[in-house]
């Protein structure tokens, strides 16, 4: 199964399956929003970390944080192990092979929080759930790609439920979801005891509909009842199809050449 060797940040590279699931703009925007949400984070967990893209991007920008990635899919977990090790981060970034839905209570919850040195709760969480409910699309015959696209182990509601159980006082959770169904994120957040603070809508080209939204949330108990969710938009290409200044700034944030050699979208 051939792998490609790709730049992730100015200092980190990742191996990805050439014909498997690959990191894309939703991962980059989620990592960017997570870094902005709590730049001083010390205890960070990425749920459903896949091959380690968001996990490593955030760790790169927040070099003082202890981090943990959780991944259930075997092929992705193996790649995450290799990618963490190849970038010299195995001492700072731990990995857990398992289903994120099992981390909401008991010894499993205690173990993941202990792994980042935060028994009372992590201060930063991220996740990039699949967007397609079971039955709404035909899963890829490739298991890695199928789990990345179809909610075979749950959707945004499940990610939010686990985030609510792991987030510490004053912490922030960042998760992306289908822009066509914002009500799912809102309902999942409420059920998990979380309140949306910011929603970034990702638009592929000026004039097009948003493809996905990246939500930043805090614990409802920590926030005033009148808290209002701020909204913003990220446009990747202008009306002429050219990369926008926002897109170039996103690459520069991770110390990459703002003129990409090829698209990651």
Give the residues covered by each predicted segment.
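Conserved Class I SAM-dependent methyltransferase catalytic core
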Residues: 153-210
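SAM/dcSAM-binding transferase cores
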Residues: 209-265
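General small-molecule cofactor/ligand-binding pocket signal
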Residues: 15, 94-96, 197-200
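Residue-level signal for inorganic ion chemistry
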Residues: 30, 128, 159, 217
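Hydrophobic/basic alpha-helical segments enriched in Actinobacteria
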Residues: 23, 122, 136, 205-206, ...
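Class I SAM-dependent transferase core
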Residues: 1-38
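Mobile active-site "lid"/loop adjacent to the S-adenosyl-L-methionine
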Residues: 129-158
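Conserved SAM/SAH cofactor-binding pocket of Class I
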Residues: 32-117, 121-127, 133-141
């Amino acid at each position: 199964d051939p792998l490609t060797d790709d730049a992730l940040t100015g200092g980190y590279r990742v191996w990805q399956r050439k014909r498997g699931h690959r990191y894309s703009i939703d991962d980059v925007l989620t990592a960017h929003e997570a870094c902005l949400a709590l730049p001083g984070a010390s205890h960070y967990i990425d749920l459903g970390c896949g091959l380690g893209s968001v996990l490593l991007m955030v760790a790169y920008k927040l070099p003082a944080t202890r981090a943990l990635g959780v991944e259930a899919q075997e092929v992705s977990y193996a790649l995450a192990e290799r990618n963490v090790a190849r970038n010299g981060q195995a001492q700072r970034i731990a990995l857990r092979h398992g289903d994120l839905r099992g981390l909401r209570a008991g010894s499993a919850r205690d173990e993941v929080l202990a792994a980042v040195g935060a028994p009372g709760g992590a201060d930063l969480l991220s996740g990039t759930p699949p967007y397609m409910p079971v039955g709404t699309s035909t899963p890829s015959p490739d298991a890695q790609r199928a789990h990345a696209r179809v909610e075979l182990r749950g959707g945004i509601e499940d990610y939010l439920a686990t985030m609510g159980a792991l987030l510490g006082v004053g912490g922030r959770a960042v998760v992306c979801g289908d822009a066509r169904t914002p009500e799912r994120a809102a309902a999942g957040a409420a059920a998990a005891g979380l309140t949306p603070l910011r929603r970034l809508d990702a638009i592929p080209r000026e004039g097009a509909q948003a493809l996905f939204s990246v939500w930043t949330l805090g614990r409802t108990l920590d926030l005033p009842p009148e808290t209002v969710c701020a909204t913003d938009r990220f446009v990747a290409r202008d009306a002429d199809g050219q990369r926008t200044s926002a897109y170039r700034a996103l690459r520069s944030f991770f110390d990459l050449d703002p003129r990409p050699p090829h698209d990651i979208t």
